[in-house]
């Protein structure tokens, strides 16, 4: 039968063939037209513009479209090439999900919950606790005051270490100081502080007691060293201070108490600093004598100094129990350095916006005001000692003295004898052991604790010999004013100015002190500064668009113009008469032309341009030399004929 399916019939070439300009498609960088098919720009008849012949005059405005057929033209004749490839429309870029499509999105409900959880954790980590900026808050602050701050600012007890430290200190302070509760050598907890200033309590005087009674006040100043800090706690009696030797019997190191007679008092005294208020019991143990003594930091209240002589001992001796050897020291534990507590607490209390801690704020402000009043210069004479600063309710605030050479020079050294070395062996400590214990190392914390009032108080003792100067009306202000600079001599930043070479004085410019090389360098700098200065009428380049006339002008007629200047009319330029040449009215060029022609030489270009410009010919314009020669020759002939006759 055969295949009966309709076979494809051949078609003519014109039905499916494309035009010749579509065989090779244009570049993809050509900007596509909207709503119509892309055409090659020269072939697109809608962009054709028919213009008239001749030159257009665009001096005042565009040409009138009377004789010009202008078709609609949306774009320029040449194709636009974009740097980026063809891009889709902005509206079509954004893919918005419909309401129904949002329900069937690929995001699971767990992902938004996880995202919210991560944001919450990041917010908790980023927000810091208000007290997190002060890591040493518990060390530099008294426990009672820190506990009040923590109750208000940290009710959730996030700072566990600070809460535990404060509660532990409160428990130790609440336990009463009962006698006999603690064995020998252990430190007794500190009794609760009161608003009363930290004075050493007066103990009752008993015939048999390990406590030392307060001595009467006499004119002789008492100097008593501070007990050294050793590992073995012991209560040493004070050795006899005589001119011959120091007799001291060390008791055996046992737990049994011994009778330690106290020596009689002599005129020589020891420096005695006020012991710090700590948690230790208020017993006054006598330390062993060392080579270096200490100054008493407490100033005298009146003109009469404190007299603290040792009371005369009787046959009844005082009981001085010797504690066993242990790691616990008999000295009070050193409290933390809290000199900056007031200023530090004011910064912390700024977090208390509701001002609930009014007592703490008042205590801090009062402490700062008292320290400012005492450190004002010129309040006391230089031979008078500054009174002791006001004792605040801060129990751990202790002032530490600096180490100076003047302090070391005032230290009293007891005489050394053989009997001392045999009976009382020297302790294994350096000569400055007590000095290191009393005057701590020069750390930043200790140096900041030293106030100007303490320095003035210790240095004033040496100045008492100059009391006669005070009777004459000389005080610290009058002396310091002699060494003070006046406001005229004080330099400021405004007065400091670097002068140029031409601003120097003439005696410095032409001085003989300059060497040859220095003078050359100086002159070079001087004239270099002068060259940098611009002339008053110098040309300054102005940024602007410059053009050289229309494109149909001849290059010779082109002129440099700004974009805002009008164009030059070409017709007057062409019809403008030539300017008179300097050779036009001269007789010499015409005579020179005749001379060249008579000799048969080649005519110079200057003469050719002159005759071409004027439109002259060589025969029409001649000099009257020939006529003059003929007239002159005729006259000569006439004269010769007359002579012959």
Curated annotation (Swiss-Prot):
Residues 1-11, 238-251, 288-299 have a biased composition (Basic and acidic residues). Residues 1-23, 168-321 are annotated as: Disordered. Pfam families: FAM47 (PF14642). InterPro entries: FAM47. It comes from the Eukaryota. PANTHER family: PROTEIN FAM47B (PTHR47415:SF1). Belongs to the FAM47 family. This is Protein FAM47B. The gene is FAM47B.
């Amino acid at each position: 039968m055969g295949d009966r399916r309709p076979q494809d019939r051949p078609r003519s070439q014109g039905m499916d063939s494309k035009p010749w300009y579509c065989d090779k498609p244009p570049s993809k960088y050509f900007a596509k037209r909207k709503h119509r098919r892309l055409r090659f720009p020269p072939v697109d008849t809608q962009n054709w513009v028919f213009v008239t012949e001749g030159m257009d005059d665009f001096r005042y405005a565009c040409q009138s479209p009377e004789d010009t057929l202008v078709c609609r033209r949306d774009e320029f004749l040449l194709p636009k090439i974009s740097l980026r490839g063809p891009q889709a429309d902005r509206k079509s870029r954004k893919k918005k999900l419909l309401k129904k499509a949002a329900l069937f999105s690929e995001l699971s409900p767990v992902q938004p919950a996880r995202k919210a959880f991560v944001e919450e954790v990041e917010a908790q980590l980023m927000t810091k606790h208000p007290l997190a900026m002060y890591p040493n808050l518990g060390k530099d602050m008294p426990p009672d005051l820190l506990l009040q701050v923590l109750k208000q600012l940290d009710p959730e007890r996030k700072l566990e270490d600070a809460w535990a430290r404060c509660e532990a200190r409160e428990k130790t302070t609440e336990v009463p100081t009962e006698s006999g509760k603690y064995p020998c050598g252990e430190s007794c907890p500190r009794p609760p502080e009161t608003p009363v200033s930290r004075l050493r309590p007066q103990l009752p005087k008993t015939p048999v007691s390990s406590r030392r009674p307060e001595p009467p006040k006499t004119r002789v100043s008492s100097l008593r060293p501070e007990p050294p800090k050793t590992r073995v706690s012991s209560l040493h009696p004070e050795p006899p201070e005589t001119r011959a030797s120091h007799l001291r019997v060390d008791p055996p190191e046992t737990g049994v108490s011994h009778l330690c007679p106290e020596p009689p008092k002599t005129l020589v005294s020891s420096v005695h600093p006020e012991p710090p208020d700590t948690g230790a019991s208020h017993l006054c143990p006598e330390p062993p004598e060392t080579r270096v003594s200490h100054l008493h930091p407490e100033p005298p209240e009146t003109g009469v100094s404190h007299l603290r002589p040792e009371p005369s001992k009787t046959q009844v001796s005082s009981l001085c129990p010797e504690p066993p050897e242990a790691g616990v020291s008999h000295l009070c534990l050193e409290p933390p350095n809290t000199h900056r507590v007031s200023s530090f607490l004011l910064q912390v209390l700024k977090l208390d916006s509701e001002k609930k801690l009014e007592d703490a704020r008042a205590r801090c402000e009062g402490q700062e005001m008292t320290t400012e009043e005492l450190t004002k210069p010129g309040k006391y004479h230089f031979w008078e000692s500054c009174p002791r600063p006001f004792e605040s309710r801060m129990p751990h605030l202790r002032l530490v003295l600096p180490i100076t050479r003047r302090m070391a020079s005032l230290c009293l050294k007891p005489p050394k004898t053989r009997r001392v070395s045999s009976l009382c062996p020297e302790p294994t400590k350096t000569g400055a052991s007590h000095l290191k214990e009393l005057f701590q190392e020069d750390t930043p914390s200790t140096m900041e604790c030293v106030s100007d009032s303490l320095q003035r108080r210790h240095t004033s003792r040496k100045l008492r010999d100059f009391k006669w100067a005070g009777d004459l009306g000389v005080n610290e202000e009058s002396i310091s004013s002699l060494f003070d600079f006046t406001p005229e001599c004080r330099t400021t930043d405004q007065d400091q100015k670097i002068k140029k070479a031409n601003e120097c004085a003439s005696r410095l410019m032409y001085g003989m002190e300059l060497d040859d090389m220095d003078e050359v360098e100086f002159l070079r700098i001087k004239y270099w500064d002068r060259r940098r200065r611009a002339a008053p009428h110098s040309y300054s380049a102005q940024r602007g668009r410059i053009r050289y006339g229309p494109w149909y002008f001849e290059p010779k007629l082109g002129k440099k113009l700004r974009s805002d200047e009008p164009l030059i009319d070409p017709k007057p330029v062409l019809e403008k008469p030539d300017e008179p040449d300097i050779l036009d009215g001269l007789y010499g060029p015409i005579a020179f032309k005749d001379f060249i022609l008579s000799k048969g030489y080649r005519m110079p270009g200057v003469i050719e341009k002159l005759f071409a410009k004027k439109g002259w010919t060589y025969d029409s314009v001649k000099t009257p030399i020939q006529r003059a020669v003929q007239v002159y020759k005729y006259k000569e002939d006439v004269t010769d004929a007359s002579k012959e006759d």
